[in-house]
């Protein structure tokens, strides 16, 4: 009896893992249709008005995410778990916006102290009530869990200042390449990351808010400055400025964050 009980549990786990769509096909189809690339592919906007017409499909996808229990999730590979969490963050954020669209200009219209959209338990995940902050800060950024600062370039907070929403779903098989492309896109986006005429490195507030994420030895890099040095050629076209960044000598300042909704307004 013990053998058959063990067999049943094992079989159930395998069947469950096989049952979940790790290609995230529904979300993939939605973003391919409603995410518009701008600025030579370095940014994106969302056609919320059109996405709203397919809200039933979005809700169906969210229900498939919510159906996954923590024990199933823990049995997946690291890339599968990361792709799941990133897609969940982005899809639940889009759904949050649609609950008020078109009468919304910023995600902060929900409120900061009361109704904070990032702290609101408006969905369930892994068998319990969840928030957007819980996905990002308590799960993806949890020390020792993934130690992957590029998640900041993948999760999208529905704001112009945020790294772009990717025009496809994140999938385990290509996650490394997808995250790296997101990093390159964001660091190449001059309105959000650049070197000024005075040789000052002006970068997104993300690098201020989450400074410690680039100080944990990621890819052998021990600081934010060393990370910028690796991508010096993306931050400026000027060889002298590139040299300054590559040597870690450029002073750093942080740009104001634009919380305007990343909407394609007609």
Predicted regions and their residues:
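Positively charged n-region of N-terminal signal peptides that target proteins for export
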Residues: 1-4
């Amino acid at each position: 009896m013990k053998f058959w009980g063990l067999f049943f549990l094992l079989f159930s786990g395998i069947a469950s893992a096989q049952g979940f769509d790790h290609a995230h096909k529904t979300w993939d189809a939605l973003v391919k249709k409603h995410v518009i690339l701008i600025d030579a592919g370095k940014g994106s906007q969302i056609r919320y008005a059109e996405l709203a017409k397919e809200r039933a499909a979005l809700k169906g996808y969210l229900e498939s995410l919510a159906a996954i229990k923590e024990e199933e999730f823990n049995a997946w590979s690291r890339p599968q778990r990361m792709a799941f969490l990133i897609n969940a963050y982005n899809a639940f954020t889009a759904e949050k916006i649609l609950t008020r669209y078109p009468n919304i200009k910023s995600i902060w219209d929900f409120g900061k102290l009361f109704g904070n959209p990032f702290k609101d338990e408006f969905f369930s995940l892994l068998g319990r009530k969840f928030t957007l902050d819980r996905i990002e800060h308590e799960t993806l950024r949890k020390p020792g869990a993934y130690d992957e600062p590029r998640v900041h370039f993948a999760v999208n907070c529905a704001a112009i200042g945020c790294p772009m929403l990717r025009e496809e779903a994140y999938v385990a098989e290509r996650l490394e390449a997808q995250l790296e492309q997101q990093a390159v896109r964001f660091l190449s986006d001059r309105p959000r990351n650049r070197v000024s005429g005075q040789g000052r490195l002006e970068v997104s507030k993300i690098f201020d808010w989450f400074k410690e994420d680039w100080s944990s030895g990621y890819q052998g890099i021990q600081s934010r400055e060393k990370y910028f040095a690796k991508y010096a050629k993306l931050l400026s076209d000027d060889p002298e400025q590139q040299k300054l960044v590559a040597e870690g000598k450029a002073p750093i300042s942080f740009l104001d964050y634009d919380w305007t909704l990343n909407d394609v307004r007609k």
